[in-house]
Amino acid sequence: MANDGGKDGCALDTTSVPAGPVTFTVANTNAPGINEVELLRDQRIVGEKENLAPGLDPVSFTVSLDGGAYQLYCPGASTEYQTLTVTGNAPATPTGTVASILGQGTKDYATYIVNQIGQLNDGVKALDAAVQSGNVEAAKAAYAKARLFWERSESTVEGFVLPGFAVGDNAGSLDYLIDMRESTPVDAKVGWKGFHAIERDLWQGGAITPGTKALSTELVGNVGKLNGIVATLQYKPEDLANGASDLIEEIQNTKITGEEEAFSHIDLVDFSGNVEGAQQAYASLRPGLEKIDANLVRQIDQQFQSVLTTLDGYRDSTALGGYKTYTAALKASDAPKLTAVIQPLHQSLSTVAQKVVTAG
């Protein structure tokens, strides 16, 4: 990704790859108008990276691709869609011992995601009950509780597009409709929807308006749609690996920066949810990964423990969500420490997909 002559461009370094595991490395040199890239097939997102600010280190994701035509979608680029041709057929899924262990892990993780989105569904209904009653303080408490379930699972479910909508149409993007942040440009055709629009009203406005009630009703409906979708999903080991890595990357890009919860400042609650979700995805892969690279498993175990120990230092039973409010002062003093403990874990998790995708 680079800006050339005032236009933000997004280019592939090859337009054809053989079927099988493919690792995509994404670098944004100086294109401020582009902050995400998605790999699509038949309007379905099969891989993605977000928060690609100019100048950050390159990031990667690994997916197993079968033969056919795919599209690389870079929202905001001068040419948003590019075609990637995958030749041949992907090798048959390995059936050896390690593959079987990893396969069981994906089933366990699918059960976990169904559980989390089910609890999210209950959580937004509780939030809606408080909003409809006009109780601001009860709504704030319900908001914090519901956020945790979204943050544990967001990397797995955020790419869903409702039937009848094209990728890139925010009217059908469940991620936009549920979790659009204050820092994200508002789609004028759709408006600001979801959790953070409600957060704005509760904390910045300090009042529940008819508009807040409408937003809450919509949120319940959209989470209900998501709840229906996740029960049908199946995952590959690399999906779990990429998801765990993405959740930790989310912490670096939106939690430590204070971008996620711009009004409530419960970013450390979201931080904890991302860690828990990443840990669950990793734990589902761990028995198989231990047979592939036991040293990496020990390293990741230690890094998770370091993160959890650091996070424990911010617990506050009197605060909303059980963690200290992430004030500007706390961010200024502690962001470097939080970044230092998160980065090594992200680097380690980012190598897992390549290891599990070909395991036999």
Annotate the PLM regions.
Residues D4-G5, A53-P94:
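Extracellular/periplasmic metallocenter environments
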Residues E36-L40:
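Beta-strand signatures of extracellular beta-sandwich domains
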Residues M1, P21-T29, A90-T97:
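Short, low-structural-confidence N-terminal segments
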Residues D13-P32, V59-P75:
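Beta-strand cores of secreted/periplasmic/IMS beta-sandwich domains, seen most often
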Residues M1-A19, D122:
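N-terminal edge beta-strand
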Residues T93-G360:
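Mature extracytoplasmic or organellar-lumen-exposed domains after removal of signal/transit peptides
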Residues A31-N35, E80:
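Short loop/turn segments at connectors of secondary-structure elements within structured domains
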Residues Q43-N51:
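Surface-exposed loop/edge segments in extracytoplasmic proteins
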